[in-house]
Amino acid sequence: MSLTLLPAVDVADGQAVRLVQGAAGSETVYGDPFDAALAWQRDGAEWIHLVDLDAAFGRGSNAELLADVVRRLDVRVELSGGIRDDASLQAALATGAARVNIGTAALEDPQWCDRVCGEYGDRVAIGLDVRGQTLSARGWTRDGGDLWEVLARLDRAGASRYVVTDITKDGTMRGPNLGLLREVCARTNAPVIASGGISTLADLRALAALEPVGVEGVIAGKALYAGAFTVAEALRTLADA
């Protein structure tokens, strides 16, 4: 088995964008979200990580647009951003997305999140957005508690998968936080998807080396948009690792 590659399409104000360290105002615009996702699909990606940044920041919604993107793609989609209650969860699942990511709600409404983990199993992943050993919530604008305490609670609730993002790395192309990923994997038996900082094929090889300890996939965004490597090159590197 090789790591799963999830090219990222982050959407703000109807456009595909990339942020630096999650900071509002740091957007680089890349155009139509469907065109971006379709390009990754044509290059061989089997998953797309699709994010509604406006919903994540609590400043609006691109729900209809994202639902249309999911419908028009032929690959599996992990949908993220603003999923905080039953209504938003049901709407996200109703798009046909293979999996949804819950971030802020895991911190702000633990009882709801624990119930959802038990009820939906593999269709829900928990996004752990980390700065140091502190979690960030609400589009990374608020602190959300101690990473290890929250991870232990989510494990007890039966969380099936974690998407771990080092916020200080995200959108910077400075390399992933391998130490953080190793430590998370050591503390949970659930699979982990790595996100943040991936900039080279060597970074992908380093992440592939963590597959035996629990890393299952990798989200790549800015490196693909910036042309650091292609989806085809990334898939080949992961297959050969």
Curated annotation (Swiss-Prot):
It catalyses: 1-(5-phospho-beta-D-ribosyl)-5-[(5-phospho-beta-D-ribosylamino)methylideneamino]imidazole-4-carboxamide = 5-[(5-phospho-1-deoxy-D-ribulos-1-ylimino)methylamino]-1-(5-phospho-beta-D-ribosyl)imidazole-4-carboxamide. CDD domains: HisA (cd04732). The active site is at D10 (proton acceptor), D129 (proton donor). InterPro entries: Aldolase_TIM (IPR013785), His_biosynth (IPR006062), HisA/PriA_Actinobacteria (IPR010188), Isoase_HisA-like (IPR044524), Isoase_HisA-like_bact (IPR023016), RibuloseP-bd_barrel (IPR011060). GO terms for cellular component: cytoplasm. It is an enzyme of class 5 (isomerase). It comes from the Bacteria. Its EC number is 5.3.1.16. Keywords: Amino-acid biosynthesis, Cytoplasm, Histidine biosynthesis, Isomerase. The keyword Amino-acid biosynthesis applies. Pfam families: His_biosynth (PF00977). One of its GO terms (biological process) is L-histidine biosynthetic process. Its main location: cytoplasm. One of its GO terms (molecular function) is 1-(5-phosphoribosyl)-5-[(5-phosphoribosylamino)methylideneamino]imidazole-4-carboxamide isomerase activity. It is found in: Cytoplasm. The keyword Mitochondrion does not apply. Pathway: Amino-acid biosynthesis; L-histidine biosynthesis; L-histidine from 5-phospho-alpha-D-ribose 1-diphosphate: step 4/9. NCBIfam families: hisA-trpF. Belongs to the HisA/HisF family. HAMAP family: HisA (MF_01014). This is 1-(5-phosphoribosyl)-5-[(5-phosphoribosylamino)methylideneamino] imidazole-4-carboxamide isomerase.
